[in-house]
Regions:
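Short acidic-aromatic linear motifs embedded in glycine-rich loops, typified by GG[WY][YF]DAGD(H)
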Residues: 1-114, 118, 122-161, 176-178
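Aromatic-lined, polymer-binding surfaces characteristic
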Residues: 181-186
Length: 186
């Protein structure tokens, strides 16, 4: 039976977790359909033809047309399977990577730095879309009480400081772009 502890025993399994932490990133940043930053302004317009021809939820078009909703917002990354889930995976990685026995320390340091930068990006995306957010430096236990699970939003400046801190910590261990192998370039 595979558990989080057994996943973080061997490098190959830890690498799968490492890669999975990155999978949440693509829909938020690169998708013209789900990232409202591309099409959510008044400069881009679309008629019903676009909406009816494609089964996709063109979040930006709806926002640009003034149809954003509070109950079920377009481009929502606060939902349970999005950014905070990604942050939880990143936190788990940061907590458990030290237990991998067949991995060089230098590679662990590199992966930790990349995950910190990734976590900072998830925080940035949340902050950009929602203003002050809930910061999660460590995972809350799944069996924690409601009082422990209810966390307040941090002030805006604190959120920015946390993002900068994570990036500063990551930067000192990440090689410059021209020194990375092609497969490691973002």
């Amino acid at each position: 039976i595979e558990t989080i502890e057994t996943i973080f025993e061997k490098r190959d399994q830890a690498e799968n977790w490492f890669k999975f932490c990155h999978t949440f990133l693509m829909p938020y940043t690169t998708s013209i359909i789900s990232n409202p930053a591309y099409t959510g302004a008044d400069e881009v317009v679309a008629g019903d033809f676009i909406r009816q021809q494609f089964a996709y939820n063109w979040a930006g078009f709806y926002i640009g047309d003034g149809l954003q909703m509070t109950a079920d917002p377009y481009g929502n990354i606060w939902r349970k399977d999005a950014a905070y889930n990604a942050i939880r995976y990143c936190n788990t990685f940061l907590e458990k990577i030290g237990g991998v026995y067949n991995m060089e320390e230098q590679e662990k340091v590199l992966w930790i730095a990349e995950i910190k930068a990734l976590k900072a990006h998830y925080y940035f995306e949340l902050l950009r879309r929602y203003g002050p957010i809930i910061l999660v430096p460590k995972n809350v236990a799944t069996n924690a009480g409601i009082g422990e699970m209810k966390q307040p939003r941090a002030p805006f400046d604190t959120c920015v400081e946390e993002i900068v801190t994570l990036l500063d910590e990551a930067m000192k261990d990440l090689p410059p772009m021209n020194q990375k192998s092609v497969s490691r370039r973002a």
